[in-house]
Structures are given as structure tokens and as C-alpha cells.
């Protein structure tokens, strides 16, 4: 057969509705908005082609390989209900297209070039199915939820954290002082803000030293294990590892990384270092909204969350749900399950397009953070359950009497909610009552309740997705 030059429709090669997916395929669900006049089959096939073996014209070297073995295939297309000219296109990629143990390569292939494609008006990656054959090539989360609880000796309740504010401008000594006050009051963790790296007003080494001092003092005082997420994110991988090494030398339990701005290559390196040296790793998702905010273009956060579980991290920020709509609650809980559980069934009502089997890759603790305070505690306890970290920045430091009383208020509220739940009370319905009862015994909690007046907890049933 002679080589036939020229441009031919993608759908002739890459749209294969009869294809039966293999267990080893990486499956992707894209939300495709084609340009006017482009049929959905052609758009879906174009996505499959450009993110695998295809290019815009037939090339002579196609004859030197087996396209059937290596091409991505668009095997199903369904219109999105309620949206005109939007389709979910399912694409199957053969496993051989990806380098083992590299999230970087996986994303370069699947979302690398194709998002700037002219035939598409918009494109969003909604979900990925990672086959066990691929996930087994990753180290994954460094320790997992059970190991973390054993390291910290904390069981049967969510963990409490607090981001130190003002995020920029404090000197190292004052920063350490704020950390000490929070930990002494009853928090498990305090946190560097994601943009605290090593700035002129507070260099990283000074901060690490003063925070370590705060950790050891508060541990001695309370008899509990304490931690501070020391942000090791830096301008180069070498500098990042240097900071992690220093944290290990100080004997602290946990460091932190901004995994999207730092990049997956750096994150995976840090995760490997931290597992080898017994450090927990807290992951912040700064920049995620640049990628996942738009409904019709970009990448859904559940994909970024799965990628993090492959790359490695022990905690990751996952939104709060509270005060938002029911639909968001279901979707958030969908990717929280993808982070924590071993086996997650396909469930379109929660935005889960594929059944995901993690084959005993350790889980990641979801972190609820952002605009939450003591009145939210019952809802947070009910929604996230024990395996989570609840982080109150302003909700601790904004307490009228200071940081330590703010920490006390949060800890008392949490313990009250956990106890009430264990006694069989309904936190969603009786939440305010539980907090009010607890505040009778805790002046710190009473003061916090007064500052952030009641928030209602009715969850109206909203339409999902």
C-alpha cells in the first residue's frame, strides 16, 4: 500500500464507537464544546488524536508504527443535558503512551496540546480512570491516614489546624509566637500560608527555627504531639529539598508544598524524600482555580486530586462545602472519597465518571479551610467525618481574646460535636444547640460564638450537576 499524503478527517481514524475498553487503558471524560459546524464525532476524535498519536495531516512515518496499538480512541459521545452544543467525549488511551511513575508525562500527553485546538471552542477534562497497572508505578501518598494517626497519636476525631495570619509581614519571632499560642490552646497543627516561602521580612531558616521552638514548647505544655506545616516550596527543586532536610534535622513532624505552582515533578521528588525520612507532607492547591474554576474549560479539581494521590501528599485542601449548595456538597464529597477511599464506584450524580480502584494506595486527608468558624463545626464534622483536617485561620486568630483562646474555642467545639455524634445526635439538625450547650462550660467558646453569630445549617436539597 503506497503512502497517501493529504489531510483526512480525524473521525475516520480516531472515532471508534465499537471499541471495547481494556482494563489497562487510561480513560478520560472530556466536556467538549465544538466550534459551530464541527460535528461532535469529529471534535471528539480530534481530542483523541491530538492528545495521543495524531497530527493535522497524514505523515509518512505513520507507516513505521502500529497506529492501532498506540492511538487514543474516542469510544463514546453523549450530549450534556441542559447545555446546547456540549458533549461528554470518552477517550481511551493505551497504557504504553505514558511513562511509568510520571504525573508530569501523563498530563503533558492528555492535556498538553489539545486545549488550544482551533476546532474546539472549549474543552474540559472532567475525570480520569487510572488503571491499577499505572497507579502501581507510583509511590503515592507518603504515609496514609492510619500511619499519620499513629505518628500523631490522635484518633476518633478530625484534626484541627490554623493558618497563621497576617500571611505576610510578621517577623520570624512574632510568627513563632503566634504558632505557639495556637498550639498551646489545643490545635494539632498550625500552617504556613501558601505564599510564605523565604521573603526579606522573614527568611525560611529563621521561621523554621522559631516554629520548631513553638512546637516543642507547646508539646511539653500539653502532652500532645504538635505540628506546623513548614512550607518548603522554593524557586528550585534543590532549594526545596534543602528546606525539607533542615526541617527533618529540627525533628518536626510535617512540611508543606504548593503542588501546582511548584509542579508535579518537584512534588513527587519531595514526596519521595519525605517518605524516606518519615516527614508528613501537607499539600496546598494554590492556583487550582485558574485551572478548575470554569465549568466548560480547563480541568475539574477531581482530576487534580487524583493526580496528587499519585504524585504524593498526606493532606490536601479540598474546599469546605459549608454554606454552599447541595450540588457542590455532593461533588466535593465525590472527590473527597476519591482521595480517602480504596474503591470508588462510578456515580454521575457526584461527578464521578468512572469506577476508580486504587488497589490499596494509601489515602490522603482532605483539608477543609477558608472562611469557617465555630458555628460551622457541627456541619464540618458531619460532612467530612473523622478522617479530615479542619483549618480555621481567621476563625482562630480572630477571637477577641487572642490566639490561644481562639484555639480553645475550636477544640471545645470539635470535642462537643464528636461526642454528640457518638451519642447518636443529628449534627445537621441540632448543631447550633450542641455548640450553645458547650459554650456554657467554655467562656472562650462563648466569646467566639458571640463574635461570629449563628449561621444556619439547613441544607436545602438542590439539583445536582
UniProtKB/Swiss-Prot annotation:
GO terms for biological process: photorespiration; reductive pentose-phosphate cycle. Binds 1 Mg(2+) ion per subunit. Pfam families: RuBisCO_large, RuBisCO_large_N. GO terms for cellular component: chloroplast. The modification N6,N6,N6-trimethyllysine is found at residue 4. Its cofactor is Mg(2+). PROSITE patterns: RUBISCO_LARGE. The disulfide bond which can form in the large chain dimeric partners within the hexadecamer appears to be associated with oxidative stress and protein turnover. Substrate binds at residues 113, 163, 167, 285, 317, 369. It comes from the Eukaryota. It is an enzyme of class 4 (lyase). It catalyses: 2 (2R)-3-phosphoglycerate + 2 H(+) = D-ribulose 1,5-bisphosphate + CO2 + H2O; D-ribulose 1,5-bisphosphate + O2 = 2-phosphoglycolate + (2R)-3-phosphoglycerate + 2 H(+). The modification N6-carboxylysine is found at residue 191. PANTHER family: RIBULOSE BISPHOSPHATE CARBOXYLASE, RIBULOSE BISPHOSPHATE CARBOXYLASE LARGE CHAIN. HAMAP family: RuBisCO_L_type1 (MF_01338). This is Ribulose bisphosphate carboxylase large chain. It comes from Ailanthus altissima.
